[in-house]
Curated annotation (Swiss-Prot):
Major subcellular location class: mitochondrion
Name listed for the protein in its UniProt record: Large ribosomal subunit protein bL35m
Gene Ontology MF term list: structural constituent of ribosome
DNA-binding listed as a keyword: no
Similarity comment text for this entry: Belongs to the bacterial ribosomal protein bL35 family.
InterPro entries named among the record's database cross-references: Ribosomal_bL35-like, Ribosomal_bL35_sf, Ribosomal_bL35m
Keywords from the UniProt entry: Mitochondrion, Ribonucleoprotein, Ribosomal protein, Transit peptide
One Gene Ontology term from the biological process aspect of the record: mitochondrial translation
Pfam assignment, any one: Ribosomal_L35p
Species: Drosophila melanogaster (Fruit fly)
Organism classification: Eukaryota, Metazoa, Ecdysozoa, Arthropoda, Hexapoda
GO cellular component: mitochondrial large ribosomal subunit; mitochondrion
Domain of life, per lineage: Eukaryota
Amino acid sequence: MLRTFVTSALRSVCRQSPAASSLVPLVQRTQRATLMTLSRPCLLPTPSLASPAHHQLLQLPGVLAATGTPSNTRNVTKFSLVKGKRKTVKAVLKRFKRLDWGAWIRTHSGRQKKLFKKSAALRRRLKQHVFTNATQSWLLDKMVTSYWRRPKHFINDPYKPYHSRNEYYATQSKTFKV
């Protein structure tokens, strides 16, 4: 709710500010509404926008990065411009698979490159999948919406044996006596 309020407030302030009119098409083109990009030009007090030096500084985002303030890196969490809700990063769905118990698996990088140079043991290991660690799983869960975090049951799923985790007591599948 706070995110929706902030984005709507930023949108209304940006509509009123004449200096921020050149920034709005940039945000709409990239479809990223990060708070860092929108808050700098729009939330400055209006008297400071009167000087031409500030107006020129606001139009050049590269100047802000050169002055020592942190530049906008690729923020993996994206937000919609209309409601401010999180969006799913499509590269996560393409490269990773989420298991029902919360872990993410992926294939080895470079598993199909220059196989003639690699030993037979390495080629065998490259065919196997790798689990992500807890930090990576937490980040990947943030990058997808709740729809993709829910368990999905597909017909003839090759990952079906890996969706249940039976080595711990808390996650063992329970058998019922009839």
